[in-house]
Amino acid sequence: MSFDHVGAGAAIWRHFRHDGRVKLAEPPIDVIAKGAFPSSAIWHQACKDVEEAVAEVDWPPGTGSFLLNPAPGRRRDGSKDTYPNGVAPMKVPAIRHLESRGWRTEALPPLPSTVLRTGDLDALYDASGTYVAFEWETGNISSSHRAMNKLVLGLIQGAVRGGFLVVLANSMRSYLTDRIGNIGELRPYLPLWSAATVPDAALRIYVAEHDALSDQVPHIPKGTDGRALY
């Protein structure tokens, strides 16, 4: 399966590409689309919710645009930070929107005791016992691989029928936390995840990018997770 032009969402991509907030850098990537589920009303509604959630993301908050400040910042010790922007605040409006649409946040579907628990999902859609998972990746590239593995494992085990990952475009890497997860470093592994043995499931990646660069906006603040900044 080729991943150069994958997904049925080209029209959606064109719409969000120009609406002024966070943009989709390319058409949605359908890593897995097997059986009847990708054509189901549940999946279509989940896609609609996620696309609307991505479109809610802007910076600075409330401006209706997503602008990144490319100027170097300063670390707590006063040294220059050439990767000045954090990433975790980006997903907050998206998660808030999904929650308003009835998705549960920081949740997992019911799992048998024999199934490995891999940490809560950012959001979970429950359509009368049919579950769809959502992750917005804000960690380093190793974290991005773990997020994809978590989603694929959930599909293989039958815990979820669908999954979404939002990951950042390569164009943002120079302005964000060093080694941030990005589509360029995930793309070579898409055929591996696509080969998962799942008879009736869907897994889609959305690639987000900034609207423009501006040194007139604040840097996106960084948080801490152990020794890592995000």
Locations of the language-model features?
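Long terminal accessory regions outside catalytic cores
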Residues: M1-E52
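N-terminal localization/anchoring segments of enzymes in phospholipid and broader phosphate metabolism
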Residues: F3, G9, H15-R21, A46, ...
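Structural motif
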Residues: T130-V132, G162
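Acidic-basic catalytic patches of nuclease active cores, encompassing PD-(D/E)XK
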Residues: D30-P112
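Catalytic cores of nucleic-acid endonucleases
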Residues: T138-A195
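Active-site metal-binding core of divalent-cation-utilizing nuclease and nuclease-like domains
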Residues: R76-N85, K91-G129, N140-N149, I156, ...
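Domain-level recognition of nuclease-like catalytic cores that cleave nucleotide substrates
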Residues: N170-Y230
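Short catalytic-loop micro-motif centered on adjacent basic/acidic residues
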Residues: A133-E137
